Amino acid sequence: MGPAQKSGTDISIDDEEEILALEKLLGAAENENTKSAESEKAKPTAPILVPKLREDNSFANAFTFEKIVKPEKQKNAAIIKEPELDSSDDEEVKNFLERKYNEYGSDINKRLKQQQENAYESKVAREVDQELKKSIHVVTSTPQPLKNPHNPIKRQSAVSTTFQRPPPVAAAVASTSQSSAPVSAVFTDPVFGLRMINPLVSSSLLQERMTGRKPVPFSGVAYHIERGDLAKDWVIAGALVSKNPVKNTKKGDPYSTWKLSDLRGEVKTISLFLFKEAHKSLWKTAEGLCLAVLNPTIFERRAGSSDVACLSIDSSQKVMILGQSKDLGTCRATKKNGDKCTSVVNLTDCDYCIFHVKQEYGKMSRRSELQSATAGRGINELRNKVLGKNEVFYGGQTFTAVPARKSAKLITKERDRLSMLAGYDVSPFAHTANHTSKPKTAEPTKIPYAERGGPVSRLAGGVEASRKQRVQDLERLRLLKEENERFEKKKQAEGHVLGSDNKKESEAGTPAVSMPTTPVPDKFKNRGFSFDASLTPKLSGSENFSFEINVGSRQAQNAKLKAAALLKKKPLEKINPNSTRGSESGKRRAIDELNEKFSSSAKRQKIDEDDRELMRKSRIEKIMAATSSHTNLVEMREREAQEEYFNKLERKEAMEEKMLTTYKMPCKAVICQVCKYTAFSASDRCKEQKHPLKVVDAEKRFFQCKDCGNRTTTVFKLPKQSCKNCKGSRWQRTAMIREKKILTGRETLSVRGDEETFMGCLAGSANLNLLVPDEE
C-alpha cells in the first residue's frame, strides 16, 4: 500500500469521528429540551377528575399481532428483500472506473441472477405445496375464515385445536359415497351460546379471557345499564346484522354505526357506534361476523328506536372477532309491494319473520282455506253463491237483470232453419184438412217434369227455376226419349225370340209400376215424411224399359268346349273292378282313417298348445321379474322426494313452533285526539268527520279467555273489553296461534249437549262427561 492511499484512509476516519461527535451533542440538547417542557407542563392547575371506564388490553391479545408482530415481520422482510451484492457489483459501485462489465454485460448478469432466484423460489414453492397436500389428506381441518384486515389468515396458527373434532362415521361414509360440497362444521361458544363456523378463538382461550368479566345477554342489557355495576368489566356479544353508511361528526371525524343481535327468540338489536381509532381499524369488518365488545360506553337511547340499547367504543382493542355466524339470515317472504323482506331471522328456528310466518304457514298447509284468518271463502264468494246468475249486489241493493225476449219473426226464422237442417219434407197429406191420405185408384198420369204439380218439398220450392233452366230440362227429356226409341228398334232387329221375351217381360213389368198406395200407419200421420211409392226417386225416361241377358247358356257352352278339349288330349280310363272307391266299405275305411288322423293331430295340437302356454307363462314371469338397469336412479329420486317431503314438514313445524313462542309483535296503532282512544285502525265515524289521527308504534298482544277459550288481540297490557263469547274478564296470555291438542273424546263428550246455567246463557263447552263405566 502506498503513502497516498494511507493518507486517504486517515482523512476518511477523522471525518467519521467528527460526524459522530456532532450527533451526540445534538441528541443531548434535544433531551434537555424535552425534560424542560415536561417540567413546565406538570406545574400549572390541579388535575381534572373525569370518570372513565377501565380499559384492559389483555382482552384483545388476539389482535396484538397486527400492532407488534406484524410491523416487526414487515421490517425483517424489507431487510431480507434488499438486493444482495456480489463481488462484481461491489466493485462496480465502489470503483466506477474499474468496473468488470459494461452496461450490456451487467444487464445480462442481472437477468441470469433473476433466473436463478426464480428457479429456487419455484422449487421451494413446489415442496411447500406437496407438504400441504400431505397434511390435508392426513388431517381434516376447518376451511379458512373470511379475509378481512382484522382476522388475517396468519392468525390461524395461534388458534388452538380444541374446536376441531373428528367427523362422525356416518358423515365420513356419506362423504366417501357422494362427491358433494364440503359442509363446514358448526361450533357453539361456551360463554355466549353463539353458533359459528370457522371460529377464530378456541373455547379454552375464550373462557380464559372471560375470567373476571361478566357476560351480559341481550335480554338483560337494559337492566344491566340501568341497575348493574358498570364499574366491573362486562362483555356483550352478538352477530353483526347490518352496517349503516359512514357519517361525519360535527368536527368532521368519520364514524360507523353497527347493529348487533344474538338472534334468540324475538330478535333484539343494539346500536354500536365506532369512533376514532375503532372506526379506522374496524370499518371494513364484514357483516355476519360474531363480535364480543368489552366495556362499551353507554349512549342515551333515541326516542322511537326499536333497539334495546345504544353503545359506543373508540378503541379497536375492545372488540374481539369470534367467527362467522351460522344462524344469521333474512326473511324469505315477499312484501305486498313486491319487494323482498329485509327482516333479520334465525335460520335455525325459521326462515320467515313474525310478520310473514302466519301467511307462509297458511300457504304450506294443504287446506289453506281453513287456516286463513277468516276461516272461510270470503264474503264475495258467499254473496255469489247466494245470489243468482242474473242478480247483482251494488250499493246495498240487489238488482235483477231483465231476461231478453225473442221477436215472433226471429222465432219463425229459427224454426224454419231447424226444420231445413233436419231435412223434413212437407207431408204429402198437407193439402187436406185433417192431414189424411186420399185413396189413389187411378194410375198416375205421366206428365213432364216441368208440368208436374202437387206438393213440393221446401228445399225444392225454395229454388225458383228460371225459364232458361226449364228449356234445358225439356231438351234433355226429348233427347232421352229419342235414345230410348233408337235402342228399342235395334233390339227388335237382333232377333224375334229375344225381342218377344223382352216384350212379354216389359208387359208383365208395366202393371208393377201402378201398385196400390201403401197404407200410412196411425203413428206416422201428421208427419212430414212421404210414404207414397210414386214419390220414390227414379231415372227419367220410359218406365217400361228393361234389358236382360241370358248368362247361363253361355256358361254351359263354355263348359262343353272345355270337356271336349280334355277328351281329345286324354281318353277316359276304364273302371277298375277291384277298386272300392265310392262303395260303402271304401267310404267307411276312409272315414276311419280320417278319424285316426284327426284324433292324433288333435292330441299333438293339445300338447303343442300346453308347451306354448308354459313358454308364455315363463316368459311373462321373466318379464315381471325383470328390473331396470337404472334402479339406483329411481331409488335416488324416491329418496329425494321423501327428503323434500320431510323437509317441508320440518319447515312447517318450525313455523308452528315460532308462532307458539310468539306472544307479541310490533305493529302500528292509531290514536284519535278527539275521541281519545287507541286501536289498530280508526273508526268509520272518525274517518267521516276527519278527526285528527296520530299513528304510533305499538305492540300487538294475544290473549285467551280462561273460561271459554275465546281469543282476542289488543295493543294494551290487558284487554279493556269483556269476552264476546261468555262476557267474562279472566284473560291469560297466549301465543299467536292456538296449540294443537289431541283429544281422546272424553274432553268433548256431552250427552245432553252444552249446558246453560240460565236462560240465554251460552257456556261454550260445558261438559258433563256422562260416560258409562266399562264393565269388568
Curated annotation (Swiss-Prot):
The modification Phosphoserine is found at S87, S88. GO terms for molecular function: DNA replication origin binding; single-stranded DNA binding; zinc ion binding. Residues 331-356 are annotated as: Zinc finger-like. Residues 30-49, 430-468, 487-521 are annotated as: Disordered. One of its GO terms (biological process) is eye-antennal disc development. It is found in: Nucleus. GO terms for cellular component: nuclear replication fork; nucleus. Keywords: DNA replication, Metal-binding, Nucleus, Phosphoprotein, Zinc, Zinc-finger. Residues 32-43 have a biased composition (Basic and acidic residues). Self-associates. Interacts with Mcm2, dup, Orc2, CDC45L and Su(var)205. The zinc finger-like domain binds a zinc ion and is involved in self-association. Proposed to be involved in DNA replication and to participate in the activation of the pre-replication complex (pre-RC). May be involved in chromosome condensation. PANTHER family: PROTEIN MCM10 HOMOLOG. Belongs to the MCM10 family. This is Protein MCM10 homolog. It comes from Drosophila melanogaster (Fruit fly).
